[in-house]
A protein has these predicted regions:
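Alpha/beta-hydrolase superfamily serine-hydrolase fold, recognizing
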Residues: 2-25, 32-308
């Protein structure tokens, strides 16, 4: 189907505001830009929100814990924000974590992992894996259920969720109930049909992705590592079930769907859901109808996995 009218209007607004893509900005300006992009007035209320720092082998790691209403122990969603491993933080994805907490009736733990270029790969997946281990070990004290832990994220956060799921399989722990991969980055390559078709004009561009990867990796060879490019993993051990969500007008569409098929081939119960007429980032764009449908699908998948 053609690009949706709401999406056209959103892109026109961005173009009218000027500023160019992330690839034309300094890292500092790009970090400010994502806060504006996903800014939500009056985000949903949850039962409680707590910021804390947790000890890891690489130092203290900031996290934010969102607790839903109702009696625990609550299932846990470990959430890793998008932003090309370079931008984004607890604030940029605060509204997204709130709606997921309420819709899926789960405790959401958002991880403020170390960003590139100050901290290159594998700092981000290492932090996300350490945070997930910590959450499982400390779930009872938090009011969470260590037997019902999922990972999820959008874009580069979806990449990190996929990486943590791979790490958990490779290392034998923790056991994960679900992986929620929202238009994930899965391969350090720019050769898919969707990258050619949607490489410019739809919010995220091919040039942006090159810029993000260049900041994230020490060198191109590092992009062949499966925890950087999950699509290149030779073996997938005990893959968790999950949902891979993609957008029709997204350069990352095909690599996300290819990874979903790879997980299916490895025996995982994976739903691949392409949203027609919409663009990269739509899960955080609350003005789009696609966001509401996607939130409902994500929540349904999480709740079903947590009920098993």
């Amino acid at each position: 189907m053609p690009l949706g009218e709401q999406e056209k209007g959103f892109i026109a607004q961005l173009e009218a505001a000027g500023g160019g893509g992330f690839n034309e900005m300094s890292v500092e300006d790009a970090r400010l830009a994502i806060l504006q992009l996903f800014k939500v007035e009056n985000p949903e209320q949850v039962a409680s929100v707590e910021d804390r720092k947790i000890p890891t082998v690489n130092g203290d790691l900031p996290i934010r814990i969102y607790t839903p209403t109702g009696d625990g122990p609550h299932p846990i969603l470990m959430f890793f924000h998008g932003g090309g491993w370079v931008v984004g933080n607890l604030e940029s994805h605060d509204a997204m974590c709130r709606v997921l907490t309420n819709a899926a009736q789960c405790m959401t733990i958002s991880v403020d992992y170390r960003l590139a270029p100050e901290h290159k790969f594998p700092a981000a997946p290492d932090d996300c894996y350490e945070a997930t281990k910590w959450a499982v070990l400390n779930a009872a004290a938090l009011g969470g259920d260590p037997q019902r832990v999922a990972v999820g994220g959008d874009s580069a956060g979806g990449n990190l969720a996929a990486a943590v799921a791979l790490m958990a399989g490779d290392r034998g722990a923790p056991s994960l109930a679900y992986q929620l991969l929202l238009y994930p980055v899965t391969n350090h390559a720019f050769d898919t049909e969707s990258c050619k078709q949607n490489g410019e004009g739809y919010l995220l561009t091919k040039k942006d992705m090159v810029w993000f990867w260049d900041h994230y990796l020490e060198n191109d060879e590092a992009g062949n590592a499966p925890y950087a490019s999950p699509l290149l993993a030779k073996y997938i051990n005990s893959p968790a079930p999950g949902l891979v969500m993609t957008a029709e007008f997204d350069p990352l569409r095909d690599e996300g769907e290819a990874y979903g098929k790879k997980l299916q081939d490895a025996g995982a119960d994976i739903t691949i859901s392409r949203y027609a007429g919409t663009i990269h980032g739509f899960f955080g764009l609350f003005q789009l109808d696609a966001q509401k449908k996607a939130l409902a699908e994500a929540a349904e998948g999480l709740k079903a996995a947590f009920a098993k």
